Amino acid sequence: MSTIAESARIHPMAVVEDGATIGEGVKIGPFCHVGPHVVLHANVELLSHAIVTGRTVIGKGTRIFPMAVVGGDPQSVHHGGEETTLTVGANCTIREGVTMNTGTADFGGQTIVGDNNLFLANSHVAHDCRVGNHVIMSNNVMLAGHVVIEDRVILGGGSAVHQFTRVGRQAFVGGLSAVSYDVIPYGMLNGNPGLLSGLNVVGMTRAGVDRAVIHRVRRAYKSIFEGPGSVRENAAAIREEYADCEQAVHILDFIAADSDRALSSPTRGQKG
């Protein structure tokens, strides 16, 4: 039996299957479909024709627009019908035609989306992705399986991110870019194949990062990608010099971390 809060408003032409949990203040419009294992927290709004299915939890205040399908089975040949999940955080906006899939059993079974994210029309979050907070995915952005998107990343329209790739905090990916390799935090990537084109200085400035700090991060960037060794060797060599710079340390930690993908760089042949 479903658990439906008294203050929830469900249109008579919507379908809420037995077993769903509907929180206070939830609004479900006409022709929506809510599956039996779905949890909608307080003040979630489903506009007409939105579908939430699978073992999916939607955080408070999130709005889902027409024709979005949230919680569908993973688009993976390895999926055998296992009970996997999707969790979407609070205050997200999921626009028309967006698709988000649950995880796959072989990789923990979870797709996780954070808070305050904006997913524009027809963007796609595949199985086992991890999306942080305050992320903007523009129209037609495609995340393949197992992608990690850190906080405050902006992905331009039509960009595509290869499976298992990481995009670091506050990076900016230009429209129609092909992201085949990890993108460092605060980096800017453009093109197909995607190449780094410097730092997201505008984004850092808007976030209140001091100009002197931005200058230091630029120096670190130059040392990493223009130094005598490999990218990882260069990053390790400057760690002590930049130990007091939060942004630089985050870049260095990102480079040092284990990853299934190489690092994007300013030149096609250099991959860290």
From Swiss-Prot:
Top-rank lineage group of the source organism: Bacteria
Gene Ontology cellular component list: cytoplasm; membrane
Swiss-Prot/TrEMBL GO biological process terms: lipid A biosynthetic process
Subcellular location: Cytoplasm
Annotated EC: 2.3.1.129
Catalytic reaction(s) noted: a (3R)-hydroxyacyl-[ACP] + UDP-N-acetyl-alpha-D-glucosamine = a UDP-3-O-[(3R)-3-hydroxyacyl]-N-acetyl-alpha-D-glucosamine + holo-[ACP]
Top enzyme class: transferase
Keywords from the UniProt entry: Acyltransferase, Cytoplasm, Lipid A biosynthesis, Lipid biosynthesis, Lipid metabolism, Repeat, Transferase
A GO molecular-function annotation: acyl-[acyl-carrier-protein]-UDP-N-acetylglucosamine O-acyltransferase activity
InterPro entries listed in its UniProt record: Acetyltransf_C, Acetyltransf_C_sf, Hexapep, Lipid_A_LpxA, Trimer_LpxA-like_sf
Location (main, coarse): cytoplasm
Pathway where this protein functions: Glycolipid biosynthesis; lipid IV(A) biosynthesis; lipid IV(A) from (3R)-3-hydroxytetradecanoyl-[acyl-carrier-protein] and UDP-N-acetyl-alpha-D-glucosamine: step 1/6
Subunit description: Homotrimer.
General function of this protein: Involved in the biosynthesis of lipid A, a phosphorylated glycolipid that anchors the lipopolysaccharide to the outer membrane of the cell.
Annotated family: Belongs to the transferase hexapeptide repeat family. LpxA subfamily.
Full protein name: Acyl-[acyl-carrier-protein]--UDP-N-acetylglucosamine O-acyltransferase
Species of origin: Rhizobium johnstonii (strain DSM 114642 / LMG 32736 / 3841)
Gene name of the encoded protein: lpxA
